[in-house]
Amino acid sequence: MTYCIGIKTNEGLVFASDSRTNAGLDNVNIYSKMFTHDVGDRTIVMVTSGNLGTSQAVYKSVEKDLKSSSGILNLNTCKDFEQIASYVGSLNIKHSSPQGINTDNVLLGSTFIIGGQIKGQKPELYLIYPQGNYIRPADSKPYLVIGEVKYGKPILDRVIKPDVSIGDASRCALISMDSTLKSDLTVGPPIDFAIYKKDENKLASLKCLSLDDEDYSKVCLSLIHISEPTRPTPI
């Protein structure tokens, strides 16, 4: 299993993904589930959950298309993020079910969160399903989660609004990830973490965080402090 987060605020975007893959108790490995493309007039971040083979095949196809000189559609030639979402969705179908959309898409497909900004356009965030279709998050809840979502979602519901600061959104993403790490052994570190600030056309931060990383530890320690019960006020 896995857990990935994408948050969109008025100030920018935040992404987080764990790195654990689990094919049984005796087959646990670490693979990055984040892909970044920060070139020219566009910044793009993708995170994924689902079938590892399909996810890796999609990422490899994206990289291959970027290197191609034949003028085929790729992340650099897409005109907007909706076309990018459609492009990644078509690759998802291609690698999970070459014969077309069927039940194999559910068994072998992957789910992606993709977001970023093309210069001159607004920042965007999309969820791409195994069947290749896609959606944007609701304006009232501008975030997307995939994978093992039940442990980390409550804090996002409480905190994430369009006007939340990029700093608070980042802290909230780490708290959400930490809640999931502590509750589900199929989700594990290191954590790939990316921050994009609106109209900067480059990633403000891209880190691979371990549990003893200073930035991550500060957030977790603040949680412990907040969770300490307050003593009743004497009458």
Give the location of each predicted region.
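Short beta-strand scaffold segments in enzyme catalytic cores
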Residues: 2-8, 13-15, 110-117, 124-126, ...
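Glycine/small-residue-rich interface belts in oligomeric ring/scaffold proteins
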Residues: 16-66, 70
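A structural-propensity feature for long, helix-poor, extended segments
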Residues: 35-52, 168, 175-191
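Contiguous domain-boundary segments centered on the initiation and propagation of an alpha-helix
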Residues: 56-131
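Flexible, glycine/charged-enriched surface loops at secondary-structure junctions
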Residues: 73-76, 98-105, 166-170, 180-193
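Conserved mixed alpha/beta catalytic, RNA-binding, or beta-rich assembly cores of soluble enzyme
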Residues: 124-161, 167, 172
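Terminal amphipathic helices with adjacent charged low-complexity linkers/tails
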Residues: 200-203, 210-211
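Single conserved hydrophobic/aromatic residue that forms the stacking wall/gate
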Residues: 224-235
